[in-house]
Curated annotation (Swiss-Prot):
The lineage of its organism: Bacteria, Pseudomonadati, Pseudomonadota, Gammaproteobacteria, Lysobacterales. A double ring-shaped homohexamer of HslV is capped on each side by a ring-shaped HslU homohexamer. The assembly of the HslU/HslV complex is dependent on binding of ATP. GO terms for molecular function: metal ion binding; threonine-type endopeptidase activity. NCBIfam families: ATP_dep_HslV, PRK05456.1. Protease subunit of a proteasome-like degradation complex believed to be a general protein degrading machinery. Na(+) binds at G163, C166, T169. It holds the Pfam family Proteasome. This is ATP-dependent protease subunit HslV. Gene3D superfamilies: Glutamine Phosphoribosylpyrophosphate, subunit 1, domain 1. Allosterically activated by HslU binding. Belongs to the peptidase T1B family. HslV subfamily. Keywords: Allosteric enzyme, Cytoplasm, Hydrolase, Metal-binding, Protease, Sodium, Threonine protease.
């Protein structure tokens, strides 16, 4: 059995004055589903005004959550905290080996913080990461373009569609919205 964890699909959708992040609940080790109800979407910050979702190795992702939350507490602003974390990621050896991606969003901004220390803002308000990320991104873009569904519903449906295609993604969706 392979010791590689395949652990998620996360999608972030921004529509109108709402932003939603959704994630599936499946954690896979090799060819075995180890857990079907993992929670990969969380609220961060003093008042829970930042949503975050992770894809990648779970221990690495929790480390990044903690580091990002510390930057958020220190700098108080999402973009600044993301850039400061990315700087650390590029300069600290222990962070360079972390195998995870973060999607973070507040009322104004959505960002991906990549495993190489990049900070990327999506041009259309939709971003997806993880093993089913391409499927979820495609589904969310189609739903955004051709329906009047709200951000929460689009994010939920996009994960469901990805779960129908990607073997590392299930339909046990956790979604949160600002």
């Amino acid at each position: 059995m392979s010791n590689v964890f395949h652990a998620t699909t996360i999608v972030c959708v921004r529509r109108g004055d709402k932003v939603a992040i959704a994630g599936d609940g499946q954690v896979t080790l090799g060819h075995t589903v180890m857990k079907s109800n993992a929670r990969k979407v969380r609220r961060l910050g003093r008042d829970g005004q930042v949503l975050a979702g992770f894809a990648g190795a779970a221990a690495d992702a929790f480390t990044l959550f903690e580091l990002f939350e510390a930057k958020l507490e220190k700098h108080g602003q999402l973009s600044r905290a993301a850039v400061e974390l990315a700087k650390d990621w590029r300069t600290e050896r222990r962070l360079g080996k972390l195998e995870a991606l973060l999607v973070v969003a507040d009322k104004e901004t959505s960002l991906v913080i990549s495993g190489t220390g990049d900070v990327i803002e999506p041009e259309d308000g939709i971003v997806a990461i993880g093993s089913g990320g391409s499927y979820a991104l495609s589904a969310a873009r189609a739903l955004m373009a051709h329906t009047a569904l709200d951000a929460r519903t689009i994010a939920t449906e996009a994960i469901g569609i990805a779960g129908n295609i990607c073997i590392y993604t299930n339909r046990n969706v956790v979604v949160d919205e600002l």
